[in-house]
Amino acid sequence: MEYRLELEHLKEGCPVMVTKLPKEILEEIVSWVKYGREIKDHPLFMLRKHENYGKNSYQLSVPSRMVEESFWLALTLRMTATLCGGHHRDYKIRKWDGHFDSYDVWLNFSYKGDHNPEHKHAGSLSGVVYCENPDLHSIYFPEYDVEFSGEPGTMITFPSHVLHEVKEQLTDNERVTIAFNIIRKDDAN
């Protein structure tokens, strides 16, 4: 069976793309979330915390071995080449060699009061995989006046320079997403 990548624009004229991930990749994602929960519940969890611009209750990088062995990585790099031009070998996940954050692929565990103010990312293409989103909490792209309430199993991608934000979460229900940044191989981190 051959997999056919189906991408849709979130809105006409908007560079945000949406795709539904195949079940085989969703199984990988479930294992990443399970791993993240184990670290989040560990007594030394704060040592592995991924810090960035936003406010999520807990963030941590997906281990490089899980990313490297995944079909998700192959799909995402092939999709990047389709969207940005060139060959999939022209792209890679942004990486921090020798650091516990390793790749720019991280889990976000969000609860009531969490939010991400308007920001952009480094790299060529960024994205979000929706793992759990019981209240369909949305990401907002102000330049295009469009929001997306990701259902589990969907992934969005957008040029890294596109401003976006996640408004304050108003419920106690856990929201779990995975964010990532992709760069051209010849670009610096």
Pin down the residues of each PLM region.
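Catalytic core of non-heme Fe(II) oxygenases with the double-stranded beta-helix
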Residues: 89-177, 181-188
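Intrinsic structural disorder
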Residues: 1, 188-189
